[in-house]
Regions:
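Active-site pocket-lining/capping segments in soluble small-molecule metabolic enzymes
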Residues: 1-150, 155-299
Length: 299
């Protein structure tokens, strides 16, 4: 019997290049330190000042050539996060974003684009058919009927649902296997489960990437002032943990899982890599290889 594997889509293709430059050699050399039921499906992100960018504001000192070379060296798909929801026709000719797509379209491993705007979907299909497309969670598809329609769209290889549908198994189980294969669940969202401002939050990022002057979105959710905490995310009703994946999602025919974190610090992203990919008995060894030595002072 074939064992179904989980594929993790990891944040910070550009933003956490330095972390992955150290982590990926460990993942290859010491594969026995990591769960054998999972693989790295992709790295996703975007450089700073991308007109088509969305979700989070990108930042990076590294070029597309550098990040692509790293991903290709390890046979990992690279995804551009171009999920701006407010694009207009005149934005489609942006030289920087087109140059990035042209570079990503040439990879030996097929690369992709995470997208929100249908205008951009049509443009990418016409001009860069080599790239696969991922429907972004920034669409905030909270109704199952919306999600079902989205997974039926042939232009998308994957669809990231709103995290509040993560546990809607009575409905998710009704999907045929080809649509189940498209679902890419956001595992570690810390956003308040009852949030009604999520779409406005994403639109604010889209406006800023377009260069529009607008006040920064201020989250008013309970506990927002403390920011992202992984322990808090684990208490979220939509959280998907390691045991959930192994015991619930994989047996049900779901295999794609997204880890958020582009706007966080690299230390926290490393904790995600340790929790989701690394066997508990080897997590300390990974820390020691990456940063932990006998002279490190925290205080």
């Amino acid at each position: 019997m074939e064992i179904r594997k989980a594929y993790f889509h990891l944040p910070g293709l550009f933003e956490f290049y330095e972390l992955y430059r150290v982590f990926l050699p460990l993942y290859r050399t010491h594969r026995d330190w990591f769960y054998d039921w999972c693989e790295i499906g992709s790295l996703y992100g975007a450089p700073a000042d991308c007109l088509w960018g969305g979700g989070r504001t990108g930042c990076s000192r590294h070029t597309a050539r550098e990040v692509l070379a790293l991903a290709q060296e390890y046979g990992i798909s690279a995804r551009l996060t171009f999920s701006n929801s407010l694009l207009r026709e005149e934005h489609l000719t942006d030289p920087k974003c087109n140059a990035l797509c042209a570079q990503f379209a040439q990879g030996s491993v097929q690369n992709g684009v995470i997208v929100h705007s249908d205008l951009l979907v049509d443009y990418l299909q016409t001009h860069y058919p080599e790239l696969y497309l991922v429907s972004s969670t920034t669409k905030v598809l909270t109704e199952f009927a919306q999600l079902e329609t989205e997974t039926a769209r042939p232009e998308f290889r994957y669809v990231v649902p709103d995290f509040r549908l993560n546990k809607a198994f009575a409905q998710l189980d009704s999907l045929p296997q080809p649509q189940k294969d498209k679902l890419e669940f956001l595992c570690n969202e810390c956003c308040w489960f009852g949030c009604t401002d999520r779409r406005r939050c994403y639109e604010n990022v889209s406006r800023r990437n377009l260069g529009e002057l607008c006040p920064e979105h201020r989250c008013t959710a309970p506990g927002a002032a403390e920011g992202y905490r992984f322990s808090k995310a684990m208490r979220n009703p939509g959280f998907i943990g390691v045991e959930d994946i192994r015991s619930t999602y994989l047996p049900r025919g779901f295999s794609q899982f997204k880890i958020e974190g582009r706007g966080l610090g690299s230390a926290l992203v490393l904790e995600f890599l340790l929790y989701y990919l690394t066997k508990p008995e080897h997590q300390l060894q990974v820390r020691e290889e990456i940063y932990l030595d006998n002279m490190l002072d925290l205080f």
